[in-house]
Swiss-Prot record:
Component of the cytosolic iron-sulfur (Fe-S) protein assembly (CIA) machinery. Required for the maturation of extramitochondrial Fe-S proteins. Part of an electron transfer chain functioning in an early step of cytosolic Fe-S biogenesis, facilitating the de novo assembly of a [4Fe-4S] cluster on the cytosolic Fe-S scaffold complex. Electrons are transferred from NADPH via a FAD- and FMN-containing diflavin oxidoreductase. This is Anamorsin homolog. A motif (Cx2C motif 1) lies at residues 210-213. Belongs to the anamorsin family. Residues 131-161 are annotated as: Linker. The C-terminal domain binds 2 Fe-S clusters but is otherwise mostly in an intrinsically disordered conformation. The N-terminal domain has structural similarity with S-adenosyl-L-methionine-dependent methyltransferases, but does not bind S-adenosyl-L-methionine. It is required for correct assembly of the 2 Fe-S clusters. Gene3D superfamilies: Vaccinia Virus protein VP39. Residues 172-186 are annotated as: Fe-S binding site A. It comes from Drosophila grimshawi (Hawaiian fruit fly). Monomer. A motif (Cx2C motif 2) lies at residues 221-224.
Amino acid sequence: MEQFKDLQKSLYIWTDSGELDKRVQTIKEATGGEVAVENVHRLSFSSYANSSFDLIVIECAQLTDNYVKLLHMLKPSGKLHLIAYIGTPASLLQEIKLSGFINCGEDTAANTLTAEKPGYETGSAARLSFAKKAAGVNVWKISGDDEELIDEEDLLDEADKQKPDPSGLRVCSTTGKRKACKNCSCGLAEELESERTTSSANTENAKSSCGNCYLGDAFRCSTCPYLGMPAFKPGEKVQLANNLLKSDI
C-alpha cells in the first residue's frame, strides 16, 4: 500500500472483525492520515457526505449495488482498493468501470484491484469546444495606402479618346427633311399638314411696322398678325387665317 502515501482521510470497509485493528493500523502507517471504519453490510445505511475520503479500502468486494455510492464518497482523484474479492477480476473491473471509475487495474501478485475516481466531481459540467474559430481579419488595421487603385485612363483605348465625326451622329428621321409614315400615329402627319397650310398663307395685304415679323415669334410684337406662325423669308407670301385681324367680340 505504499502507493497511498500522504492521504489525509481513508475509509476501511470490513467483514471480519478479527483483524480489524491490524488492518486499520496498516492503513494508517501507509497513508499517514485518519482512518474511518464501516461494516460492509451497513454501508447502504451510512450517510457519508460526498467527497469525504481520499482512499476507500474494501476487504470483500460484494458491492455490485454500492460502487456508485463509493464513487460519490471519494474525493476527485480518490483511490478505491480491493484487498479481497469474490469472483473473477475481469467481471469486477467491468462493474467498477461501469460505475464511473477510471484507471482500473489488477495486481496479480498481491491479489488486489485498484481504481481511481476521475479528477472532477460527479455531476460537474464543462463547456466543450468542438471547432476552433478562425481568427478574423482585423480590417480596421489595414492601411489604405496599400490598396492598388486602377487608373481610369488605362481603361480607355486610343479610339475612345478621339472625338466623333458629327456626320456620324445623325439619327434617322430626326435630321434633314421630316416625312411621316404611311400609318402615322405619333401626330407627325398632322403637324406636317398644319405647317403646309400655314406656310401657304397670303401676306399681300399684311404690313409689318417693325420689319422683324419674318424672324419668328421671338422677334414679333404681341399684336403681330404673324404670331404663332413659323418664320419665313423676307418677301415670301404668307396667307393669314380668315379669323385673324378680327375682333373676338
